[in-house]
């Protein structure tokens, strides 16, 4: 396996599997996946674009489709996509209704998407941006750059995509996405750290240990603890997300299980 080809091969496989998707001219240097039925010149709805570093599949290219993303901008593994790639994606799918950029709260993503948005506006495109920072592992004051963007971005993508599909204006789609981003909170639990293709897996987490709030790129979490029964882990996570420190509240909850964790369960 050639490490540099990992992202390219993922995109090729995705597009070959789903005929409703395509990639832009310039691939693989420009790693942009778009809906095959979305053409900027004629697209009559708000375009919803997200993206970021690869290595978190199915995010974000796997979320391109009707009622969700119009396009996904893919960087290399754990690397923000370039300004040129983001701008190419905007130009490809943005019509008269404008474009909403959904950006996870990481410095590189915010910088590159922000620069691309400024350039697109200077070319006459209508652009709005929503930043998603849903990580509840660390109190706000302990996060220098603010909360990290995590799996809660999926909800923001879906709500924005549904609003765009319904024909709402750019301002209304952005407002719905912003409200969703303010209402979502996420905390993860990991039994091992992430592994980059072609590199040795870290042994920082030993057997029988788990890390609460480990970052999706291997950033330190809130604490390392002994492995606990799943009900204890879930209870701790919910208390953190719903605490006054994190400022999330609501009468209903939704749960995402992005991967199976072999946590021990209690015998009843």
Model-predicted regions and their roles:
Residues 1-48:
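N-terminal amphipathic/basic leader segments beginning at the initiator methionine
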Residues 43-51, 60-73, 137-140, 210-226, ...:
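Gly-rich Lys/Arg/Thr-decorated short loops/hinges at beta-loop-alpha junctions or inter-strand turns
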Residues 46-53, 69-72, 98-107, 114-117, ...:
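Short glycine-rich or small-residue beta-strand-to-loop segments that form or flank ligand, phosphate
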Residues 56, 60-96, 235, 239-244:
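Glycine-rich oxoanion-binding loops at beta->alpha junctions
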Residues 57-60, 83-87, 108-114, 137-140, ...:
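Short glycine/serine/threonine-rich phosphate/pyrophosphate-binding segments
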Residues 110-125, 143:
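Short Gly/Thr/Asp-enriched flexible loops that form oxyanion-binding sites at enzyme active sites
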Residues 132-183:
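Short alpha-helices
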Residues 164-268:
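Mixed-charge interfacial surface used for oligomerization/domain docking
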């Amino acid at each position: 396996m050639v490490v540099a080809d990992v992202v390219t091969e993922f995109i090729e496989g995705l597009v070959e599997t789903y005929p409703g998707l395509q990639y832009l001219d310039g691939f693989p240097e420009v790693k942009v996946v778009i809906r095959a039925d979305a053409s900027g010149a004629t697209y009559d709805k708000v375009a919803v674009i997200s993206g970021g570093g690869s290595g978190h599949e199915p995010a974000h290219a796997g979320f391109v489709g009707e009622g969700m993303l119009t396009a996904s901008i893919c960087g290399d593994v754990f690397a923000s996509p370039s300004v040129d790639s983001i701008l190419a994606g905007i130009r490809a799918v943005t019509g008269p209704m404008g474009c909403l950029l959904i950006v996870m709260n990481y410095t590189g993503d915010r910088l590159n998407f922000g620069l691309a948005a400024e350039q697109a506006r200077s070319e006459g495109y209508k652009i709005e941006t929503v930043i998603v920072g849903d990580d509840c592992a660390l109190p706000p004051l302990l996060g220098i750059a603010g909360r990290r963007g995590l799996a809660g971005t999926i909800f923001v993508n879906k709500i924005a995509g549904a609003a765009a599909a319904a024909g709402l204006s750019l301002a209304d789609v952005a407002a719905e996405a912003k409200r969703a981003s303010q209402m979502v909170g996420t905390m993860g639990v990991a039994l091992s750290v992430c592994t980059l293709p072609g590199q040795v897996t870290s042994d920082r987490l030993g057997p029988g240990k788990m890390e609460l709030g480990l970052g999706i790129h291997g950033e330190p979490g809130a604490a390392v603890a002994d492995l606990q029964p799943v009900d204890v882990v879930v209870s701790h996570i919910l208390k953190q997300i719903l605490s006054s420190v994190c400022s999330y509240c609501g009468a209903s909850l939704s749960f995402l299980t992005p991967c199976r964790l072999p946590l021990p369960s209690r015998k009843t």
